[in-house]
Amino acid sequence: MAPAGGDIEAYAAQCGGAVTGTMQTGLRRRGILATGAAFLATAASAPGLRVQELRAQELRDRLPGQEVAPILFVHGNADSAALWMHTIWRFESNYYPRARLFAVDMRLPAARRAETARDSSRSSVAEATAQLAQEIARFRRATGIERLVLVAHGRGGNIVRNFLRGGGAARIRAAILCGAPSHGMIVSDTHMVGSEFNGASPFLRSLNAMPGGVPSGVPVYTIASDQADKWAQPDGQFLGLPGVATGISHTGPALRGATNIVLPGIDHLETAYSLAAFTEIYRIATGEAPTLARIRQEVKPTLNGRVSAYEAGAPTNIGIAGARVRVFAVDPGTGQRIGQERHDRITGPDGAWGPLDVEPDFHYEFELSVRGYPITHIYQPPFPRGSDYVHRRPYLPDRDDPRDGALVTVVRPRGFFDFGRDRIEIGGQAIGGALGVPSENTLRATSTATAAAMPVQYNAQRITGRTWPIAQRRVTVIELGE
């Protein structure tokens, strides 16, 4: 909805941002909080007041009697809260209060291979649900608001439904499930037996026994791909079972009792972390389309996060003490360090490596040293806004790693590479891959040069890192933003 006194295109131009429209023609839904239009109209008409300078606190001040819903974001299998960073930035850029946005880090984010098999490096459904309940209680205490909105990706969506089924529904305003394997990744008595991702498991059978697959009293929304989610496929190729019928269709994430939203062409990760997904999440939470698609810069962003590692090959979100994090500003064209390090810290028991104030348009290198792992040099785009979710894990060695030269890993954390859609170059060489359903978000390259610029082009995004000698147990990780 356009602000009073002008159209939305003019207003967006004033703010320097693009306009994001509806992703589904004719889709109408009642928002959890219809605040956006009223706030923007007031802001735009205030004499002499720059919209860009309004703080999120003023959203509450200008809407007496209305409550800004807290939103808790839950990541998927083997992931971390860091994946929600851009989504949170986009909410903030549309003047949602930072204090009402929180992303949970599941301590052991990877699911057990079988629910009944004890595994200290992975979590069961019961363990993950118990931690989610604790995080919800903590968030409610922090905000002083009884009911909140849950937004979950992948495995997190099923954990949210389990929490709601177990008595948590009274504390939730709405649940938004993005790319959740609602009916499993396979339905089988012979494959993935005991896995929480098997639709024949006791867990999913009981979860889907609820009328419509959802608890009463809580609006539930699903966001899914039309056919490009690797975990909602009729063939078991991505489960290591090519040619085996999974019993799951492209509509696997949908639930009969939910409002089901389908976004064409997006992959499994993009069901939660893409701009298209954000538009739907924001619309559900506020009742309005976001006004800004771009991420607004802060004058002086402050970064922080946690260093974690792996246990028995599975990632954890448990902080590590004694890790060293050095941060350097780098030349965006060469990856060369500019001056001395901007930050140098040894982590304490909680694994926190910050805080660090940065320039919003600078490129940085993070040098991460964790006992037992290669020194990891991480290069990524500038940070336009501050975040407490700039988490770091060291590179996990692979038996196929080279013994000499340099190793470069390119990661797209919030989406898979689509070789039929994306332009990808590493070191000036075009990278191709299998067409069809996007399924990989990590690319590896080797180089004989051990101290050279390594530019990576991903569509319009360009990041240049440096190669490091693997013989010195050093590797390069180039992390894409979008």
What is each residue range found by the language model?
Residues I71-N77, A81-A82, H86-R90, Y96-P97, ...:
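Serine-dependent carboxylesterase/thioesterase catalytic core
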Residues P349-E365, R371-G372, S439-A453, W468-Q472, ...:
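Short Pro-Gly-centered beta-turn/loop motif in secreted/extracellular proteins
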Residues P301-G313, G405-F417, D422:
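A short, amphipathic beta-strand motif
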Residues I281-T302, E311:
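Beta-strand-rich domain onsets/edges
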Residues D331-A352, I463:
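Short, acidic Ser/Thr/Gly-rich low-complexity loop/linker segments typical of extracellular
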Residues Y310-I338, F416-G436:
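Short, ordered, surface-exposed loop/turn motifs in non-cytosolic proteins
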